[in-house]
Amino acid sequence: MGHRLIHGASESCALPHGHNEFVTVRLDPTSLARLDGRGNMPVSFQKAKQTWHRFVDERLDHALQLAGDDPLLAWFKTHEPARAARIVVTPGDPTTELMVCLLMAKINAFLLAEGGVLRCSELSIEETPTNTVSFSGNPEEMIPAGRSPEACWWNRADMSISD
């Protein structure tokens, strides 16, 4: 994915640029139960990853990440509205630290909508071979506040990447 950081973190990151990011997700059952002696898993791997993989492949792959107040976002909405739909809009700069929290909230929304048998307990993004950010905990405690949770794309079990 590509992004740019406009709020002073690094001048070299202020221009749009990309990374070959690898996202790793750890899923845990929401409650412990003895395996059934047949399938021996709470949910099949195919079912557990189906919605998430579709989201990554169809919405995140080749997407651009921009802050909600980035002037480039307004430009796309005015001049290239079809391409604006491919922009991941974040509350503030789309740093890797923020993205791990947003994506953890998103996968947990998917998992809850699919029965809540599993939850994401850790999410890591490898931005470069020497830079990986991992998060475990409650992403809502880290994501910038200011909007109702229902109004945020990362809390909805749909394919949205902006509001």
Residue map of PLM features:
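Charge-rich, low-complexity N-terminal segments
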Residues: 1-163
